[in-house]
């Protein structure tokens, strides 16, 4: 019987460098991590349609990477933002990227969910925290450790996005870039960005802050954090989160300084990825069926010239475009396939969320909590720092 073996072409295969001995190799890795993180988040949160992604392989993990697509202007715009991030990253100006989701096109400062990607530049080669907190300091690290940390971070993002409650049907995206002011020229702006007007944002509902993870090389440190509404965490599997949780006080402001990450006002819900991965290893068949495709490639962002074989199932098309009364409004389904039951009253009317009640009480009392991405708790008045926002929103 004739058999055929599927070969991964060099263009479709993505591998980490065998070793990270130069700053350029480290930069390529960090770019890949940023690309696959953003792609994973936007794909699993259902922000763009299936056609906006192409398929790539991260070792044995099939992943999706965001690409320019003439039929999806939003994905094309986000690709341009990413290229602007790369420009600032290469110049060592970029300190943090904030990708925020909001629901009112007229009010991009009121957000519903956001993702923070933080960057540090170093020549000391710090070790990665995911192995052990008691490790001795070394001047270099094994590339296998970097590779393991990178895959671990991607899997953490995947599992968190898979288990979060769904976003509203219609959402918009914006991005804010923060810099190291001491080295960034005052007039510098990456391609596609302009000087920002409002440093802080208003967060809808009660925020939950999550430290997803980090990857370190001898030249860079890359961290990922997520802020979402607590209501989206209600149905999350308790085994996914680390048992060492700190309760979030209502409407606490996140002071996003590394030195404050261990303070009480910052919720540190670390993802317990090992437990989830062990469950998947015990049941590999179900894991293979449930794990969606995520991705990255050599230059991180695929171009619209490529035409990978993508298939869109009927259920996915319905999820993206069918908004008729025939839809069952008692439940919603994420792209990962997980079904969430909507809260209903009297069998047919949705229950008003506590988020809506909180927003109403805030407006009635005149209290609006400002969420500062970039300020110190020791500053009575947050210092005005340079940051950028897109010339065009999605």
Curated annotation (Swiss-Prot):
Per UniProt, the ranges with Basic and acidic residues bias are: 253-282, 362-374
Residues spanning the membrane = none
PTM note: Phosphorylated at Ser-377 in a SPO11-dependent manner.
Point out residues bearing the modification Phosphoserine: 376
Question: What's one Pfam family here?
Answer: HORMA
- Record has Phosphoprotein as a keyword: yes
- Composition skew (Polar residues), residue ranges: 310-324, 343-352
Outline the extent of the HORMA domain: 24-226
Q: What does this protein do?
A: Plays a key role in meiotic progression. Regulates 3 different functions during meiosis: ensures that sufficient numbers of processed DNA double-strand breaks (DSBs) are available for successful homology search by increasing the steady-state numbers of single-stranded DSB ends. Promotes synaptonemal-complex formation independently of its role in homology search.
What subunit structure does UniProt give?
A: Interacts with HORMAD2. Interacts with IHO1.
**Which named protein is this?**
HORMA domain-containing protein 1
The lineage is: Eukaryota, Metazoa, Chordata, Craniata, Vertebrata
């Amino acid at each position: 019987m004739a058999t055929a073996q599927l070969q991964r072409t060099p263009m479709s295969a993505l591998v980490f460098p065998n070793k990270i001995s130069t700053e350029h190799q480290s930069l390529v890795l960090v770019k890949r991590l940023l690309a696959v993180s953003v792609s994973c988040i936007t794909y699993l949160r259902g922000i763009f349609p299936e056609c906006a992604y192409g398929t790539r392989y991260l070792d044995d993990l099939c992943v999706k990477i965001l690409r320019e697509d003439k039929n999806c202007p939003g994905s094309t715009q986000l690709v341009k933002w990413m290229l602007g991030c790369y420009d600032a990253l290469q110049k060592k100006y970029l300190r943090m990227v904030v990708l925020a989701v909001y629901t009112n096109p007229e009010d991009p400062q009121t957000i519903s969910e956001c993702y923070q990607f933080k960057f540090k530049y170093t020549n000391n080669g710090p070790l990665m925290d995911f192995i052990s907190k008691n490790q001795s300091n070394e001047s270099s690290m094994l590339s296998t450790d970097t590779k393991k940390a990178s895959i671990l971070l991607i899997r953490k993002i995947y599992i968190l996005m898979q288990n979060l409650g769904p976003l509203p049907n219609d959402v918009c995206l914006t991005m804010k870039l923060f810099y190291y002011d001491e080295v960034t020229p005052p007039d510098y702006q990456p391609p596609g960005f302009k000087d920002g007007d409002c440093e802080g944002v208003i967060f809808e509902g009660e925020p939950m802050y999550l430290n997803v993870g980090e990857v370190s090389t001898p030249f860079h440190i890359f961290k990922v954090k997520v802020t979402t509404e607590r209501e989206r965490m209600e149905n999350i599997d308790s085994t996914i989160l680390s048992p060492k949780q700190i309760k979030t006080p209502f409407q606490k402001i996140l002071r996003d300084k590394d030195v404050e990450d261990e303070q009480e006002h910052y919720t540190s819900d670390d993802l317990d990825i090992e437990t989830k991965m062990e469950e998947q290893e015990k049941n590999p068949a179900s894991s293979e069926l449930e794990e969606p495709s995520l991705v990255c490639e050599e230059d991180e962002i695929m171009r619209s010239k490529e035409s990978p074989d993508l298939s869109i199932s009927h259920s996915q098309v319905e999820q993206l475009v069918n908004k008729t009364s025939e839809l069952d409004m008692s439940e919603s389904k994420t792209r990962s396939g997980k079904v969430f039951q909507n809260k209903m009253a009297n069998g047919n009317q949705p229950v008003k969320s506590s988020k809506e009640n909180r927003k109403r009480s805030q407006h009635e009392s005149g209290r609006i909590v400002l969420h500062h991405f970039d300020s110190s708790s020791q500053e009575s008045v947050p210092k005005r720092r340079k940051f950028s926002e897109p010339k065009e929103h999605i």
